[in-house]
């Protein structure tokens, strides 16, 4: 099994098969607009712009599960990301990342790379690095600066 077997709805409502990202290195991130870590969008965009021509993509999945820090609707989220951080990488519709109602992709991601003490995602901006075959290679804590992941991305490109 790999992440290529899942699909998710883009922020514009279009269903997107993750198999469309075969042969790409991915960084999948649960995001929020009203979090102290929200400025990480800037570094995520820098990584995307730096490596997109080499087969790298960031996939952002907004979630409101942590202290209601993503209260906006899909249009508000898309506008916020573009206006404040110039985000041009794919942003998906808001999802749940923990619990029985967690999106199947996040159930899979956490089963493949658990966190410290638990599989659960503890906060916004948890990051999962995916290789070109769709395998979950590494999980990064919310506090990990996206730029610090650069060497790991380059190894997979």
Curated annotation (Swiss-Prot):
PROSITE patterns: GLUTATHIONE_PEROXID_1, GLUTATHIONE_PEROXID_2, GLUTATHIONE_PEROXID_3
Gene Ontology biological-process entries: cellular response to oxidative stress
Keyword check for Oxidoreductase: yes
EC number: 1.-.-.-
Active-site residues, as the UniProt record annotates them: 35
Keywords tagged on the record: Oxidoreductase, Peroxidase
UniProt KW Oxidoreductase keyword: yes
InterPro entries attached to this UniProt entry: Glutathione_peroxidase, GPX_AS, GPX_CS, Thioredoxin-like_sf
Organism superkingdom: Bacteria
Single GO MF descriptor: peroxidase activity
Similarity-based family: Belongs to the glutathione peroxidase family.
Protein name, per record: Glutathione peroxidase homolog BsaA
Organism ancestry: Bacteria, Bacillati, Bacillota, Bacilli, Bacillales
Gene this chain is encoded by: bsaA
């Amino acid at each position: 099994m790999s992440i290529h077997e899942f699909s998710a709805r883009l922020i514009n409502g279009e269903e997107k098969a993750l198999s469309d990202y075969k042969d790409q290195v991915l960084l999948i991130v649960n995001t929020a607009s009203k979090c102290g870590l929200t400025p990480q969008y800037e570094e995520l965009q820098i990584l995307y712009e730096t490596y997109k021509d080499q087969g790298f993509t960031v996939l952002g999945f907004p979630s409101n599960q942590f202290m209601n820090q993503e209260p906006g609707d899909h249009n508000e989220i898309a506008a916020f990301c573009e206006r404040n951080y110039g985000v041009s990488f794919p942003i998906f519709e808001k999802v749940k990342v923990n619990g029985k109602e967690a999106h199947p992709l996040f159930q899979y991601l956490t089963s493949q790379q658990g966190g410290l003490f638990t599989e659960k995602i503890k906060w916004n901006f948890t990051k999962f690095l995916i290789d070109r075959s769709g395998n979950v290679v590494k999980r990064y804590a919310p506090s990990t600066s996206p730029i610090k992941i650069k060497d790991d991305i380059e190894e997979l490109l």
